A protein has these predicted regions:
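Small/polar beta-strand repeat architecture
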Residues: 1-90
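Parallel beta-helix/beta-solenoid repeats that form elongated, surface-exposed shafts/blades used
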Residues: 33-37, 75, 100, 132, ...
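Hydrophobic pocket-lining residues within nucleotide cofactor-binding pockets
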Residues: 52, 130, 173, 200, ...
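Extracellular beta-strand/beta-solenoid scaffold signature
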Residues: 61-63, 77-87, 102-120, 134-160, ...
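Leucine-rich solenoid repeat scaffolds
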Residues: 218-227
Length: 227
């Protein structure tokens, strides 16, 4: 369960055992999409709590960052607010039964944040309702371009593999609410997404896949209803 850190690795706040309990994420290359917790580490070696199922190799890109996982947000409501946002490193989480009215929407943000690549993997956004989809962000005061239509938005910026394995299912989106991806310039920044059994009522774009053909990849859009 030991991995060796390359001599040319880019590090930040990397002192012995400072990141115990944190996570080692394979974000690209062989073994991508796996993470393990750190049991202990020196400046050159990391001991994991358990081995990877697929071992990393010289093609693998690894990020060491915080672990936030197994979180459940059930049957909450928001009116006239900003985003209900998963910000940075989050894994194996569920947002279910959320009702939003005139908000920025539900945002899953896997990004390069505070000098660390913080991926967002294996999120379920299900059984939510987004209604009255016009959103005004400090309109007329300091909008900063944030006003627009309410959305379920998957962000993957700052590298490959920032957003992997999100399921968006059985949501009701009305009055210009919609689903979108917002990848950065890297290939597979947002990947392996299921958009299924959702209902749309009045939308400029029901589903908008951002970037080019490789920035957002591996998307299944199935059995949605459009009015």
């Amino acid at each position: 369960n030991i991995i060796t850190i390359p001599e040319d690795a880019e590090t930040n706040q990397w002192t012995e055992n400072h990141w115990n309990g944190g996570g080692v994420y394979i974000i690209n290359g062989t073994g991508a999409g796996q993470f393990r917790r750190i049991r202990s580490h020196t400046l050159t070696k990391i001991e994991l709590d358990q081995p990877f199922l697929v071992q990393p190799d010289a093609t693998s890109e690894i990020s060491v960052t915080t672990v936030r996982h197994h979180l459940y947000f059930i049957n909450n409501e928001a009116v006239d607010v900003g985003a209900y946002q998963l910000y940075g490193s989050v894994q194996n989480c569920v947002i279910s039964g959320m009702t939003m009215t005139r908000c920025n929407g539900i945002v899953g943000r896997g990004s390069l944040l505070y000098r660390g690549k913080q991926p967002e993997w294996y999120i379920d956004i299900v059984n939510c309702r987004l209604k009255e989809g016009n959103y005004s962000h400090w309109f007329g005061i300091d909008d900063r371009g944030h006003s627009g239509h309410q959305s379920i938005n998957l962000i993957g910026s700052g590298g490959t593999g920032m957003s992997i394995g999100t399921v968006i299912r059985r949501n009701v989106l009305s009055e210009y609410s919609y689903i979108r991806t917002s990848p950065g310039a890297n290939p597979d920044a947002v990947t392996d997404v299921i958009i299924e059994d959702n209902s749309f009522d009045i939308a400029k774009n029901a589903v908008l896949l951002g970037g080019n053909a490789t920035n957002t990849s591996g998307v299944l859009i199935h059995n949605n209803r459009y009015n």
